[in-house]
């Protein structure tokens, strides 16, 4: 059982989890697995309201299209589909994958579909965002993320220096999660954030604006926000916020 007090009496959460279990049953009947993942599982463990449901499967987009009706396939070439259940619950379904070759400091140049969660989790950013949940609502954790969440610790999966060089926007995501969930930033991650802060110049203003606006809109501790913004001279980035 999770160590968190999960609010299963919450009717909205119940409805969404039941919709997931129903959808997972459909996948199983066709020989595939479906798991909830990332922020959906993190928020479930924290007892927070669930938004759209993020899920992963060992089925490819083409395989999913063969048995699941009314799916949106705009990003199928990237391994991602959108689906709305009969109950109106929205799911983002991504095929398990491995990513490599971040040539533009943002997007992988190579995506390879895989079958194993122990491979898929390595492409994710932070341990608290790399948790999976199966159809029985059992947590699957390959990187001690549940324990890090319990201990209010934000850690990068893999080498923080390399992962931030892949995508410098992870610096701002780390700041956002630090503030949103009161997570202490791991020393190695914090050092890598400072070392590579200048790489944010390679990210578009629109992407930076989006992350900063998410931070701005959160109900966060004022002193924590003031401290972390001062550490990283966020004021120089705030000029892109409209």
For the regions a protein language model found, what residue spans apply to each?
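Catalytic cores of the polymerase beta-like nucleotidyltransferase superfamily
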Residues: 3-242
């Amino acid at each position: 059982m999770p160590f968190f007090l999960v609010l299963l009496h919450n009717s909205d959460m119940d409805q969404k989890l039941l919709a997931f279990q129903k959808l997972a049953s459909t996948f199983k009947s066709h020989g595939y697995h479906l798991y909830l993942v990332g922020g959906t599982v993190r928020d479930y463990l924290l007892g927070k309201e669930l938004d759209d449901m993020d899920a992963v499967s060992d089925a490819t987009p083409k395989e999913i299209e063969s048995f699941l009706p009314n799916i949106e396939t705009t990003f199928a070439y990237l391994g991602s589909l959108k689906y709305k259940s009969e109950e109106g619950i929205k799911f983002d379904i991504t095929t398990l994958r491995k990513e490599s070759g971040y040539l533009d400091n943002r997007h992988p140049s190579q995506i390879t579909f895989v079958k194993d969660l122990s491979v898929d989790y390595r492409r994710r950013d932070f341990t608290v965002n790399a948790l999976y949940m199966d159809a029985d609502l059992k947590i699957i954790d390959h990187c001690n993320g549940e324990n890090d969440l319990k201990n209010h610790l934000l850690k990068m999966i893999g080498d923080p220096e390399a992962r931030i060089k892949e995508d410098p926007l992870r610096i701002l995501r780390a700041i956002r999660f630090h503030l949103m969930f009161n997570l202490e930033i791991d020393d190695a991650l914090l050092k890598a954030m400072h070392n590579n802060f200048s790489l944010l110049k390679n990210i578009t203003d629109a992407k930076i604006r989006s992350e900063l606006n998410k931070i701005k809109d959160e109900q966060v501790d004022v002193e924590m926000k003031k401290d972390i913004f001062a550490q990283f001279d966020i004021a120089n980035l705030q000029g892109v916020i409209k």
